[in-house]
Regions:
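Hydrophobic faces of well-ordered beta-strands that scaffold small-molecule active sites
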Residues: 5-9, 34-36, 79-83, 107-109, ...
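Catalytic cores of alpha/beta
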Residues: 16-28, 94-96, 141-153, 192, ...
Length: 246
């Protein structure tokens, strides 16, 4: 089975037109999915690189997603949305309906099981009512009992962080992290992200049994310079790394 490569983009960074053009320009067959991050006032589990992309919060609204979603649909590229519960909780119903109306079917909520565990079960139920599946977000610090509970409450693939946040470099044994994740979650596809530093890390994840990777921090500087070519080249390097690992 082909290993999956997901690319994270913060909507509105560096500007709305660039993001739409970038999604249109990425060569066919390279990216399996885009993670579209809703700009956050408190992206607490993102590292410095991704956090820097959230400065355009006041210049983005959900209507700006429409062009990107049309392009991805036409190109048959899967899309999920990443949003912090701290940003959508106060107007949860309208936000979920707006996403559902745009045929968004998968959502990652990094702070849900950590900071809002008391509302997580009810939120997952409301997601299901609007046709959206929660993609559980775990990392090496997530207790097994929490993983088991939310694996049983969901049916999507799993997002598993190598690190507690993106763009940081705490020493970690990648093979051990992947093997532990697979032992606790034996029957679901697991995509690893949050802390992949280079192609070597990506290869090690796949060789240890991971089903794919998600990258974002690696291309932030290129996006900030409006350099589509450099960002695409980095994505190609990760594609080649995971393809050669099989």
């Amino acid at each position: 089975m082909k290993s999956r490569l997901l690319v994270y983009l913060t909507l509105g960074f560096p500007d709305n037109e660039f993001v739409e053009d970038f999604v249109r320009t990425v060569p066919d067959g390279i990216v399996d999915g885009f993670e579209l991050g809703l700009p956050s006032s408190d992206p607490r589990y993102d590292g410095p690189k991704i956090r820097s992309t959230h400065g355009n919060r006041n210049h983005f609204n959900l209507d700006k997603m429409d062009g990107i979603l049309r392009i991805c649909s036409d190109r048959k590229i899967r899309v999920n949305v990443l949003s912090y519960y701290s940003d959508i909780g106060n107007s949860e119903s309208s936000n979920l309906l707006a996403l559902s109306d745009r045929s968004v079917h998968e959502m990652i909520v990094p702070d849900l099981l950590i900071d809002y565990a008391e509302v997580a079960d009810a939120f997952i139920s409301r997601l299901k009512e609007t046709g959206i599946s929660l993609i559980p977000f775990f990392n090496a610090a997530t207790p097994d009992r929490v993983i088991e509970k939310y694996v049983n409450k969901t049916c999507s693939w799993i997002y598993y962080g190598l690190q507690p946040s993106t763009g940081i470099n705490v020493p970690v044994n990648i093979s051990d992290v992947v093997e532990r994740a697979k032992s606790v979650i034996p029957e679901r596809d697991i995509i690893f992200g949050f802390g992949i530093r280079n192609g070597g890390d990506a290869m090690e994840i796949i060789r240890a049994g991971g089903h794919g990777i998600a990258i974002g921090s690696a291309i932030v500087d290129d996006l900030a310079r409006h350099d589509k070519g450099a960002a695409i080249q980095k994505i190609l390097e990760y594609r080649e790394a995971i393809d050669s690992a099989v």
